Every structure is written in C-alpha cells, then in structure tokens.
C-alpha cells in the first residue's frame, strides 16, 4: 500500500495562510487562548479528522482512494480600530485565499470551506472565530 504524507497538505495550507501576509502568527501547534494571546491577528490550523474514500479507480495494484482532511482554522482578531463587522471581511479574505488556485497547492487536488462560526463578542475588542475546511488529496492505493 502506498500512501500520502498527511503533513504535506497541512503544510500547504499553512503556506497559503502565510502568503496572505495578513496574520502575524500562523501556527499548526498549540492553540493559544484568545484572552492571553499576545500576537494578533493569529490563525491556528488543526486537523480534526481524515477519511479515505474509494474514488472508483481500479489499478493493477488495487483500488484507489482519495483522502479528505477535515481541518479547523481558529482565528484570533483585535477589532480595536475596526468596525463591528470587520471579522466578516477577514473571514471572506481567508476563504478567498484558500479557494484561489495557487502553485502552493501541490498535493491538494480540491478544497472547500464548510462554514464558520464566531464568538458572541464577550471578549471585545478581541474576536475569535473558527472556519471548517475540507482538503481533498489523492490518498492511497490498497
């Protein structure tokens, strides 16, 4: 069985977010608490789960599977000098960067944004949100 390195698509996503030149911190490590976060704006990439799905292609060495990675982006913002809906502009900018074709996408053959949710403003002017993504890669042959 041959398989794809799961780190590769996560690193590609991290590179896309860094190339935006918007976030002061792009991390695949431990998610900081919004209240104690010292570097804003920041974004954290977390792999929630992965699924291998038969894509119907049969080869001489077995069936081919696509891998779908379910990823959460946690976004921390400071809206001190921004309007109340600034976080929606950030959300749209992140979504556009992810969906735009780029040479930085190497192993990811498709991607989509499933949705987002945001806090209710209890820590204003700081704002926290999450975006859920699906990254599709050519997975493995079994």
Outline where the language-model segments fall:
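Low-complexity, acidic Ser/Thr/Pro/Gly-rich terminal tails and inter-domain linkers that flank the onset
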Residues: 39-49
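Charged, amphipathic alpha-helical segments and their flanking helix caps
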Residues: 1-35, 49-142
